[in-house]
Amino acid sequence: MASSASLQRFLPPYPHAAASRCRPPGVRARPVQSSTVSAPSSSTPAADEAVSAERLEPRVEQREGRYWVLKEKYRTGLNPQEKVKLGKEPMSLFMEGGIKELAKMPMEEIEADKLSKEDIDVRLKWLGLFHRRKHQYGRFMMRLKLPNGVTTSEQTRYLASVIEAYGKEGCADVTTRQNWQIRGVTLPDVPAILDGLNAVGLTSLQSGMDNVRNPVGNPLAGIDPDEIVDTRSYTNLLSSYITSNFQGNPTITNLPRKWNVCVIGSHDLYEHPHINDLAYMPAVKGGKFGFNLLVGGFISPKRWEEALPLDAWVPGDDIIPVCKAVLEAYRDLGTRGNRQKTRMMWLIDELGMEAFRSEVEKRMPNGVLERAAPEDLIDKKWQRRDYLGVHPQKQEGMSYVGLHVPVGRVQAADMFELARLADEYGSGELRLTVEQNIVIPNVKNEKVEALLSEPLLQKFSPQPSLLLKGLVACTGNQFCGQAIIETKQRALLVTSQVEKLVSVPRAVRMHWTGCPNSCGQVQVADIGFMGCLTKDSAGKIVEAADIFVGGRVGSDSHLAGAYKKSVPCDELAPIVADILVERFGAVRREREEDEE
């Protein structure tokens, strides 16, 4: 375990770097053929009934001039997480410097005190720190905020230096929200790491528990010849609002549950709007550019729903006021009992969409929320493009190169090399994607061949196999205490086994998640695997997976349905091969050989 005596290695290497926090260029909407907004194929709420004034009374109130807490009369039937929040304000660990004192405490002393034990297991998630009590006791995963998935070589080197210090315990993952998670962190080092993050323009604040997750945007923003709008300015505005410019924003840190937001910038819908609590869909109204809004999309163990139209449009300049209004309506009115029924869609179901919309509208600065534009700018016939490999940018003489990162896992040496490649061949920038891959933008065409010959691209290939290129996997039980099965190595193994059985004519997206929380987003995959346990033919308990089939992304988005339950992992490959033959046009290898 890293010693607190070694804190110096995490201190800011470049004190001036915080000045680089200002974000990329402005918005550019380009005219494209409009298409009508289509509601996702989710069941719509029942017809609105009158909602009582009592039900619309806010359940939280502001205390001490900053923190929002649950009112006394609503404190019955709470879930355990809400009780932890009431026991001590989680944001005080950051906003009042509590983390510095906690970091000095020995683990034995922490364990002996109920509040401090809750601090390391629950409240530190408000600072993006997740104690790996079950699998890496005393070590933490740290999740960052990386709006639009855009990061710099300087930031990447800093993160690499952090995980390098932890040896075999340290590594990093690209997440399904265009983000970094770093592993192996020890508590005594946290204050220095937070300072180091701040110096390079990063934060981990408000990235876990009942907070707004990383704002997602088009990974090709600003370089895509066919983009509708550059999403970077919007996602950076959202991130700045969410964390109040890294200072902490306690008005939205006591939500009933986590909350996801994305801004759509292309016809490809790389951002997966249908599974976000709030999705901004580009649309023009009265000749003015703005966004139609979708709300309520989510994935959870018991239920998954596609986002629904709010029947609302906002000008591009008003993305923050409406985000604030939606969040405050959810914060004020959401229920806090059964944890499986606290996502925002449950509130929409209870109130009805029109009543929910009314609550959002009255929280707008001028009390007005315009009705949706009749058409958005998404081309519903658009074929989703592959960003892996070499592709021309809108900037003449430039290309971007998409690299496949197998199941998103990256080591310190890989990160140092990625930073070097970004500097040597590009503009010092990297883009992370929701499929756990990395894009190097702004590569001069004359440098492309040299980049493709770099040794790292043997590991992070720009041209992976058709089954590997769409492979996504959550952390799994190697590090996550909630995961039922190992996922990352299992995903690679099963894919390798399947590739020996069949040949596919196109990419097939396969997602793995270690438990029903579905961090691996199996419901958006062509074929998904959700971890569980079952008995094999000998009656032995073994790792298994529920299989999902039929998820779609892009202009024809749709969530997958259950196909087969509790299949032992060792028996998955032939079943997956059958699915690929029956539904995806795959050809069995023995047939290929016969034809040759």
UniProtKB/Swiss-Prot annotation:
Cofactor: siroheme; [4Fe-4S] cluster
Keywords for this protein: 4Fe-4S, Chloroplast, Electron transport, Heme, Iron, Iron-sulfur, Metal-binding, Nitrate assimilation, Oxidoreductase, Plastid, Repeat, Transit peptide, Transport
Cited Pfam families: NIR_SIR, NIR_SIR_ferr
Presence of keyword Transport: yes
Domain of life the protein comes from: Eukaryota
Entry binding sites for siroheme: 519
Pathway where this protein functions: Nitrogen metabolism; nitrate reduction (assimilation)
Keyword Lipoprotein included in the entry's annotation: no
Compositional bias ranges of the Low complexity kind: 31-47
GO CC list: chloroplast
Molecular function (Gene Ontology), one example: ferredoxin-nitrite reductase activity
Residues engaged in binding [4Fe-4S] cluster: 474, 480, 515, 519
Catalytic activities: 6 oxidized [2Fe-2S]-[ferredoxin] + NH4(+) + 2 H2O = nitrite + 6 reduced [2Fe-2S]-[ferredoxin] + 8 H(+)
PROSITE patterns: NIR_SIR (PS00365)
Annotated compartments: Plastid, Chloroplast
NCBIfam families: PRK09566.1
Subunit architecture: Monomer.
Family the UniProt entry places it in: Belongs to the nitrite and sulfite reductase 4Fe-4S domain family.
Identification of the protein by name: Ferredoxin--nitrite reductase, chloroplastic
Lineage of producing organism: Eukaryota, Viridiplantae, Streptophyta, Embryophyta, Tracheophyta
